[in-house]
Amino acid sequence: MIPARRFLLSPFVGVTFIVVLVSLYFRSSFKSPQHQYQKRLFSAEELALYNGTDETLPILLGILGSVFDVTKGKFHYGSGGGYNHFAGRDASRAFVSGNFTGDGLTDSLQGLSSSEVKSIVDWRGFYSRTYTPVGKLVGRYYDSQGNPTKHLKGAEAKASRGAQLMEKQKTEEAKQSNCNSRWSQDEGGEVWCDVGVPRLVQRPLEIAITGSMSKRCACFEEDQLDQSGLEIYKDCEPLAKTCRV
């Protein structure tokens, strides 16, 4: 049996100790950028540094104040990429507006409908599932302590309301089947019903969902045609099953 003193002084123990130290050193030295930025609070000026122009830095993107590392999507988010306009900033509005220049690249959701705000919240969910969250952007949606602001809570509430209205509209419209439709450049469009006749009807929840009114084509039986709000297609016979549009 090797005496304790001889064991502690043996070359084998010394080499093992050095290997362990080196291992710990490299483990601490090569932490991923995602780990280094975890739970960090960014200012707008700081976030702008991670816009893909400096290849030594990760590429970060903000949406509703949540910041994600999108470096693995460098082809899209890096300099010259199709989505580079989102890098280094929170351009939440542009996810639904399609305005990728000037004032369009803003985190303000003012004037957007509940369905549009829901789409932005859904986009945030996509980034949460696909990329690594690395912190919060101090400003409109998070305060200097990293707590959600009234703007974030309001956006999430509006998105939730939009989801409820869309589900309600889907349920209501399922009660009256949609018309069949087709369109070609040569012949134009037409709508038809396998059962019943086509009528244009208002979508009553649409203004609350999208901010504007719209109509859809639905099929009605003859004994339902006395309902208010049913519109006959122009130049179409009242009981025709097919109408040109």
Swiss-Prot record:
It is a single-pass membrane protein. Coiled coil: none annotated. Induction: By auxin. Residues 45-138 are annotated as: Steroid-binding. InterPro entries: Cyt_B5-like_heme/steroid-bd, Cyt_B5-like_heme/steroid_sf, MAPR/NEUFC/NENF-like. GO terms for molecular function: steroid binding. Residues 39-138 form the Cytochrome b5 heme-binding domain. GO terms for cellular component: membrane. The chain crosses the membrane at residues 6-26. Pfam families: Cyt-b5. Keywords: Lipid-binding, Membrane, Steroid-binding, Transmembrane, Transmembrane helix. It is found in: Membrane. Its main location: membrane. Belongs to the cytochrome b5 family. MAPR subfamily. PANTHER family: MEMBRANE-ASSOCIATED PROGESTERONE RECEPTOR COMPONENT-RELATED (PTHR10281), NEUFERRICIN (PTHR10281:SF4). The cytochrome b5 heme-binding domain lacks one of the conserved iron-binding His residues at position 100. This is Membrane-associated progesterone-binding protein 4. It comes from Arabidopsis thaliana (Mouse-ear cress). The gene is MAPR4.
